[in-house]
Amino acid sequence: MGDKWIGAALSDPLRILASPLVILRRDDDTKTLENIESLVKTHQPDLLIIGLPISLNGTIGPQAEKVKSFSELLSRHLNIEIIYRDERFSTDEARRKMNDSGKNNKTVRDDAAAAAVILQDYLDETNPPCCQP
């Protein structure tokens, strides 16, 4: 969640695969809340996974505090659980995946792809493999 853009991603119903959904322009908190509320009403997620921009040294800096403040407002407004995930290197991973898939980074914004990376990390961590040998 940046100051100008918010990437959104969804998982499949089985919570196995995350996919980029949309990129929202972040104009002001009221408009941003309305846009996210519309997505939540449409897709009815159980919870929201929010990328937290933790500093490279592992500390919570001013940008992460801004994200947490807005996320708390979002949670109260939508009455939905928020789970924070470290978003360090998610954009780099998203760009690598887009490049590997042949998508041109100049024409595709990477915010939603980074959101999918963050969500996929959460899904992989919380869902054990379905089939153990």
UniProtKB/Swiss-Prot annotation:
A GO cellular component term found in this entry reads: cytosol
Q: Subcellular location, in the record's words?
A: Cytoplasm
A GO MF term: nuclease activity
User: Which key words are in the record?
Assistant: Cytoplasm, Hydrolase, Nuclease, Ribosome biogenesis
Q: What class of enzyme is it?
A: hydrolase
- Where in the chain are disulfide-linked cysteines found? none
Q: What is its EC number?
A: 3.1.-.-
Signal peptide residues are none
One of its GO biological process terms is: rRNA 5'-end processing
The main location class comes to cytoplasm
What the entry lists under InterPro entries is as follows: RNaseH-like_sf (IPR012337), YqgF (IPR005227), YqgF/RNaseH-like_dom (IPR006641), YqgF/RNaseH-like_dom_sf (IPR037027)
Which family does the UniProt entry place this protein in?
Belongs to the YqgF nuclease family.
Q: Which PANTHER family match?
A: POLYNUCLEOTIDYL TRANSFERASE, RIBONUCLEASE H-LIKE SUPERFAMILY PROTEIN
The function of this protein is: Could be a nuclease involved in processing of the 5'-end of pre-16S rRNA.
Protein name, entry field: Putative pre-16S rRNA nuclease
Species annotation: Dehalococcoides mccartyi (strain CBDB1)
User: What are the top taxonomic ranks of the organism?
Assistant: Bacteria, Bacillati, Chloroflexota, Dehalococcoidia, Dehalococcoidales
